[in-house]
């Protein structure tokens, strides 16, 4: 029984989860907004908020902690974006740097999908790129005519 165990396993091995969150976090930092499943988005939220907190602390230690969480070629680039662009925007905020907006279920497998984005930071992608998962109004849907 998994009593008092934090986090979702997402049906992946530990190394696969580590790589998944590293890649999702890097994409979120670069694009400021991504679309993913609800479960991944909920886990990614705490992962990214910790990275922003490290960036706010700044210094060599914070940079190394970020690069430890996002290894590889993109680690330095992500650390620079977090420290120089994102962290200053949240200097007066104590947490809650991201928001999760639920969208329609994905068409092919009906998976619940969400948009995760940074609060108060303009995204780099356009609304047309996000339109594939926009909200449906009540009453809309597949109606036979």
Regions found by a protein language model. Give the residues of each.
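Structured, basic alpha/beta domains of bacterial-type, RNA-associated proteins
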Residues: 1-19, 23-145
């Amino acid at each position: 029984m998994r009593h008092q165990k934090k986090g979702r396993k997402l049906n992946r091995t530990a190394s696969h989860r580590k790589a998944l969150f590293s890649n999702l976090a890097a994409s979120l930092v670069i694009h400021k907004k991504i679309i993913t499943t609800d479960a991944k988005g909920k886990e990614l939220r705490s992962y990214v908020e910790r990275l922003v907190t490290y960036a706010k602390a700044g210094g060599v230690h914070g940079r190394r902690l970020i690069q430890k969480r996002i290894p590889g070629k993109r680690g330095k680039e992500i650390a620079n974006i977090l420290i120089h662009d994102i962290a200053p925007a949240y200097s007066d905020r104590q947490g809650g740097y991201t928001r999760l907006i639920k969208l329609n279920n994905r068409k092919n497998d009906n998976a619940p999908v969400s948009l995760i984005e940074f609060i108060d930071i303009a995204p780099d992608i356009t609304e047309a790129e996000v339109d594939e998962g926009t909200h449906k109004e009540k009453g809309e849907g597949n109606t036979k005519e």
